[in-house]
């Protein structure tokens, strides 16, 4: 009669989660009236997981592989909504970076030279601290650059939108000409 609502397939779980579910069921059978807090139970499970043999872990890994195959097969047949990313027009102007990002660009090389073994995350944290401790006077040049970049961006965006509208009008008039209709020029 009506459309059937197709539910999204249940996600696959790891071998450790399969072990957890099995261990939980065994624990409930052995001690049905005992309550164990989540933290304590998790600790027991992780200790047990580390102590079991590779042969036993292989059983759970096989279950996880089967579950993954099931999930992938169900996703192939799933017709529900999937998010599609909007394709970005390469001619569309890009938004200007923030004053903080300009600050990061200026200080990244310096921090990397001073600390060559730092990861990108560590450098980012350091620049974040530098920015938060910087005074308004130190931030002012970056904010001025951002203001200039923003003004330029909005000019380019306005020009881009005008060009897009002109292209749309041209396409519409061309389509109508192909159909033999006359288009009023305004």
Curated annotation (Swiss-Prot):
One of its GO terms (molecular function) is DNA binding, bending. Keywords: Chromosome, DNA-binding, Nucleus, Repeat. SMART domains: HMG. Its main location: nucleus. One of its GO terms (biological process) is regulation of transcription by RNA polymerase II. This is High mobility group protein B4. It is found in: Nucleus; Chromosome. Belongs to the HMGB family. The keyword DNA-binding applies. Gene3D superfamilies: High mobility group box domain. Pfam families: HMG_box (PF00505), HMG_box_2 (PF09011).
């Amino acid at each position: 009669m009506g459309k059937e609502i197709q539910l999204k397939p249940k996600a696959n779980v790891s071998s450790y989660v399969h072990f957890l579910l099995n261990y939980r069921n065994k624990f409930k059978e052995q001690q049905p009236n005992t309550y164990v807090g989540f933290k304590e139970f998790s600790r027991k499970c992780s200790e047990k997981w580390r102590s079991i043999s590779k042969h036993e872990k292989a059983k759970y890994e096989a279950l996880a592989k089967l579950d993954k195959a099931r999930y992938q097969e169900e996703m192939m047949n799933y017709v529900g909504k999937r998010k599609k990313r909007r394709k970005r027009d390469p001619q569309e102007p890009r938004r200007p970076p923030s004053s903080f990002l300009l600050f990061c660009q200026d200080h990244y090389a310096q921090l990397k030279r001073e600390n060559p073994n730092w990861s990108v995350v560590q450098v980012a944290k350091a620049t974040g601290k530098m920015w938060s401790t910087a005074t308004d006077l130190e931030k002012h040049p970056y904010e001025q650059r951002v203001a200039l970049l923003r003004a330029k961006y909005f000019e380019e965006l306005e020009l881009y939108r005008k060009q897009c509208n002109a292209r749309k009008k041209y396409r519409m008039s061309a389509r109508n000409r192909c159909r033999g209709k006359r288009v009023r020029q305004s």
